[in-house]
Amino acid sequence: MNEARQSGPYKVLTSKKTDAALAKCVQYEWQNQSIFGGTPGATLQPGRDTGYTVFTEGSQYFVDIQPKGSGAEAKYYVVVGNWIANKRLAAPQGCL
């Protein structure tokens, strides 16, 4: 994950929701998003200093969510850029 962070996010999104609410929504959506007929699951953990990180199995797709102003900022990272990366992006976008 650190290598992906050093390369920069695939997409940066802002939300009026709190960081906790946004993180829980992304986790829920990823846990229920079917890829190849299965659901890969998603894990939510506290961020390094503040906020949260939500990641899929294998950590190929993850989002760092930090409080920003009265809402939150979500930085979406991909390890493998493919059509699944765009499908995974729909979850954080839908949670804004």
Predicted region positions:
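Terminal, regulation- and interaction-focused segments at domain boundaries
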Residues: M1-F36
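C-terminal partner/receptor-binding element of secreted or periplasmic proteins
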Residues: E73-L96
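A short, aromatic/hydrophobic, helix- or strand-capping loop or linear motif
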Residues: Q33-Q45
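Mid-chain, structured segments of secreted extracytoplasmic proteins
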Residues: P46-V80
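A short, polar/proline- and glycine-enriched secondary-structure boundary/capping micro-motif
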Residues: S34-I35, I65, I84-L89
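A generic structural signal for ordered alpha-helices
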Residues: M1-A4, T43, Q66
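Extracytoplasmic/secreted envelope proteins and their assembly/folding machinery
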Residues: D19, A23, Q27, F62, ...
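Surface-exposed, polar/charged interaction patches used for macromolecular assembly or partner binding
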Residues: G37, T50-Y52, A90-L96
